[in-house]
């Protein structure tokens, strides 16, 4: 994977004011996202113009530079603002601050997207409760860290 030095500088500059940001780019976060990127690319399910929607986008991740057309949704407006205006300001990403369960069911973007990624399933109710009208592929992950505050949907 090529390293975007400007993105790295943006992350480092913003992390001076926000230590939580570093957690979103921690080695475990990085490796899990890298694995998803590899699995998606190995499946040959995307075209160069594929639209990808990321649920629970947080501050963004290495998923954003890995793909061309991204919509990142997160319920936290402060996180979305930092991702949009500070970290990924030079990327073609549509950042949306909404609850996935409110936004996605009626979104025309969901109907037309090729891939929906959620690497934050542990923070949300079961995705089975989210009824979507789409032919998209899904890449969902959770973890087994039951003891962390805010983790409501872990798996073993």
Which role does the model predict for each range below?
Residues 50, 68, 111-114:
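Conserved acidic residues
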Residues 69-74:
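Conserved SAM-binding motif I beta-strand of class I
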Residues 58-68:
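Conserved SAM-binding loop of SAM-dependent methyltransferases across substrates and taxa
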Residues 125-156:
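C-terminal substrate-binding/active-site "lid" region of AdoMet-derived donor-dependent transferases
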Residues 65-66, 106-109, 126-132:
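A short acidic, amphipathic alpha-helical/loop segment
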Residues 47-59:
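Conserved class I S-adenosyl-L-methionine
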């Amino acid at each position: 994977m090529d390293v975007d030095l400007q993105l790295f500088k943006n992350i480092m500059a913003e992390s001076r004011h926000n230590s939580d940001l570093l957690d979103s780019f921690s080695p475990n976060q990085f490796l899990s996202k890298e694995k998803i990127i590899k699995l998606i690319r190995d499946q040959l399910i995307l075209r160069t113009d594929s639209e990808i929607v990321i649920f629970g986008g947080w501050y963004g991740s290495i998923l954003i530079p890995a793909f061309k057309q991204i919509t990142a949704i997160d319920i936290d407006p402060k996180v979305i603002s930092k991702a949009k205006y500070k970290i990924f300001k030079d990327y073609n990403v549509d950042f949306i601050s909404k609850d996935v369960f409110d936004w996605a069911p009626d979104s025309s973007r969901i109907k037309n997207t090729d891939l929906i990624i959620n690497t934050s399933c542990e923070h949300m109710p079961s995705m089975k409760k989210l009824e979507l009208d789409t032919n998209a592929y899904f890449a969902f992950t959770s973890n087994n860290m039951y003891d962390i505050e805010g983790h409501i949907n872990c798996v073993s």
